[in-house]
Design a protein with these regions (language model features):
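Hinge/beta->alpha junction and helix N-cap segments in small-molecule ligand-binding domains
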Residues: 5-16, 32-79, 92-100, 122-126, ...
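Short acidic capping loops at alpha-helix termini that bridge into adjacent secondary structure
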Residues: 27-29, 59-63, 113-119
Length: 187
């Protein structure tokens, strides 16, 4: 039976974020994605690959990783990737928590975010993690969890009112907010 759903455009926004980094000259872009098999992670992976394909390029599979959205996972993955040759010049982080770990790894390697390494993080909607207040400020994607929750409540009302689940499919656009953490590739 068809299901009702509401989702954000994970593929589209990851393609836009990756495209932006490619346009800045980055070619070694690490994707720190969510857990393997999760629908959103599959969509983000597809968006990342589509950005490369649109330019006739292929991403380096060694720079694509899946894992939990934690500071520790971001730190460990980024630390090991930074030691690689060639190292990534940019990261697409699947969450702000992952991005915090990448930020720590970049700093501990003596590099500056937005200069030697760029990053765009997904989801800056956490009230306790303000991307504008970070130094440097974090380039992020943004979608309103609160608005989605409100809309899901409305859609549940429609389902209870007899609307067929197969008629309720909403894909929401996601904003890309560019700040200081994403800069041109350094020679």
């Amino acid at each position: 039976a068809p299901h009702a759903w509401l989702d954000i455009d994970n593929a589209g926004v990851t393609e836009r974020a990756t495209s932006h980094l490619l346009d800045l000259g980055h070619r070694h872009i690490a994707l720190l994605n969510g857990p393997k098999g999760m629908t959103f992670a599959l969509h983000r992976d597809a968006g990342y690959r589509a950005a490369f394909a649109a330019r006739g390029l292929s991403p380096n599979p060694a720079l694509i990783h899946n894992g939990a959205f934690t500071d520790e996972t971001g730190f460990r993955l980024a630390q090991s990737l930074i030691e690689r040759t060639p190292r990534p010049t940019a990261f697409v982080a699947g969450s702000m928590m992952t991005a915090l770990g990448v930020f720590r790894a970049v700093r501990s390697a003596g590099m500056q975010l937005g200069k030697e390494v760029s990053m765009i993080a997904h989801d800056d909607v956490f009230p306790y993690l303000n991307a504008d207040n970070m130094v440097p400020s974090m380039s992020t994607t943004r979608s309103s969890i609160r608005a989605a929750g409100t809309r899901i409540g409305e859609l549940l009302g429609q389902l209870l009112g007899g609307k067929p689940p197969g008629e309720i499919h909403e894909l929401w656009p996601v904003e890309l907010v560019l700040r200081e953490s994403s800069g041109p590739v350094q020679d």
